[in-house]
């Protein structure tokens, strides 16, 4: 994969349209989690250091092409100023003359791009208008790269364009995980339903050596093999699909690891009475809520011989103890191998990030993607419009 970075760009004296993701949670007028804001700081600082004037483009919420006061980006300005250590100039209705008049060192934020219906329609008129506001385009919003919108794809084809530092790090990590990985490659795929991971499994089978299947979706595969799963969450209607996936994996010489032992309970609540059974001995009135200790030992041993791990989804109902044990123990095993320099570990997806934070190891993986849908679509092998536009772009 080839794309320009900030290192390839001459930014001195130029207005740099910078697409960021600052779609952060708020409570009234206060940002409650500034993680996405702090992650864009290196890009903004580097643009300033190279003599450019960053003009940030971003969306906030889903206003559906209308002006919604509660979805104004103005609410993010205090958090941006705190993270960046300097004032941020907020402009509701930008024009080139106003931006040209800004002194060197100015950071600007333009109002919510989704206040115009032309944004999500990737309307050429809006892309052209945005392009008229800058000299260079920098995309630092991998999390929005799977959307072909005017501010993520359209404008990138009209200006010299590059990836910001966060985008660069994300693409480099994903390339290391799936593009040209060190082998053996192990994928952990968990979550509640097989139906949401069909494209993902189909793509991974062709690219990795082993897939560990956990969470509720493992029950569907077990049932497809004739295993009784009691009252567990299970998509029984996808039995044929699960069997087809297993056949495809066998043909591709991709090993599938399913739970060999299970943790069951009669109800899903904190501290519920639970027991460990071999996978073929699940009581009819119980539900599978986690993988058992023998399965976790198998997973840890698999990590021990792997060179690359890609993780998407928890191994059990990690939100409630004690059904978090498999996810926590396996995550710590992967983190330990990573910290020892033996493993490249890349993880992403909302539940995955929450699970790794719960295990206390999110900062011990090689890379944690907070991109959500874009991360999943990348793992599914789909083309991301925002990334494709950067690959086709010319440097400044």
Curated annotation (Swiss-Prot):
One Gene Ontology biological process: glycolytic process
Keywords: ATP-binding, Cytoplasm, Glycolysis, Kinase, Nucleotide-binding, Transferase
Predominant location category: cytoplasm
Enzyme Commission no: 2.7.2.3
GO cellular component term of the entry, any: cytosol
Annotated Pfam families: PGK (PF00162)
InterPro entries: Phosphoglycerate_kinase, Phosphoglycerate_kinase_N, Phosphoglycerate_kinase_sf
Catalyses which reaction(s): (2R)-3-phosphoglycerate + ATP = (2R)-3-phospho-glyceroyl phosphate + ADP
Chain sites annotated for binding substrate: 21-23, 36, 59-62, 114, 147
Alphabetized Gene3D superfamilies for the sequence: Phosphoglycerate kinase, N-terminal domain (3.40.50.1260)
Location(s), subcellular: Cytoplasm
GO molecular function: ADP binding; ATP binding; phosphoglycerate kinase activity
Pathway linked to the protein: Carbohydrate degradation; glycolysis; pyruvate from D-glyceraldehyde 3-phosphate: step 2/5
Residues at which ATP binds: 197, 319, 349-352
Homology family: Belongs to the phosphoglycerate kinase family.
Subunit record text: Monomer.
Protein name: Phosphoglycerate kinase
């Amino acid at each position: 994969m080839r794309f320009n970075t900030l290192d390839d760009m001459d930014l001195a004296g130029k207005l740099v349209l910078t697409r960021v993701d600052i779609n952060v949670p708020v409570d009234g007028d206060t940002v409650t989690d500034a993680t996405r804001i702090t992650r864009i700081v290196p890009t903004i600082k580097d643009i300033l250091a190279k003599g450019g004037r960053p003009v940030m483009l971003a969306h906030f919420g889903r206003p559906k092409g209308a002006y919604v006061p509660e979805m104004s980006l103005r609410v993010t300005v205090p958090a941006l100023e705190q993270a960046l250590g300097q004032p941020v100039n907020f402009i509701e209705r930008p024009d080139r003359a106003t931006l040209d008049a800004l002194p060197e060192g100015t950071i600007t934020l333009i109002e919510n791009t989704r206040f115009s219906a032309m944004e999500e329609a990737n309307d050429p008129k809006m892309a052209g208008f945005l392009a008229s506001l800058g000299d260079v385009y920098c995309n630092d919003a991998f999390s929005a790269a799977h959307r072909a919108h005017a501010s993520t794809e359209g404008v990138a084809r009209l200006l010299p364009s590059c990836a910001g530092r966060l985008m660069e790090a994300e693409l480099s990590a994903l390339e290391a995980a799936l593009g040209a990985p060190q082998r053996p490659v192990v994928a952990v795929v968990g979550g509640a339903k097989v139906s949401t991971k069909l494209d993902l499994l189909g793509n991974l089978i062709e690219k990795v050596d082993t897939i560990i299947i956990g969470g509720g979706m493992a029950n569907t595969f077990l049932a497809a093999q004739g295993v009784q799963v009691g009252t567990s969450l299970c998509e029984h209607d996808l039995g044929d699909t699960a069997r087809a996936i297993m056949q495809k994996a066998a043909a591709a010489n991709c090993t599938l690891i399913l739970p060999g032992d299970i943790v069951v309970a009669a109800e899903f609540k904190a501290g519920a009475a639970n027991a460990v059974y071999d996978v073929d001995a699940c009581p009819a009135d119980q539900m599978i809520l986690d993988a058992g200790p023998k399965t976790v030992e198998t997973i840890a041993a698999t990590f021990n011989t792997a060179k690359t791990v890609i993780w998407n989804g928890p191994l059990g109902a990690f939100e409630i103890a004690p059904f978090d044990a498999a996810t926590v123990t396996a995550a710590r095993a992967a983190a330990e191998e990573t910290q020892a320099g033996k493993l490249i570990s890349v993880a992403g997806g909302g539940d995955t990030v929450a699970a790794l934070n719960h295990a206390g190891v999110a900062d011990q993986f090689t890379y944690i993607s907070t991109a959500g849908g874009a991360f999943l679509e990348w793992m599914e092998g789909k083309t991301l419009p925002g990334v494709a536009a950067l690959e086709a772009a010319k440097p400044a």
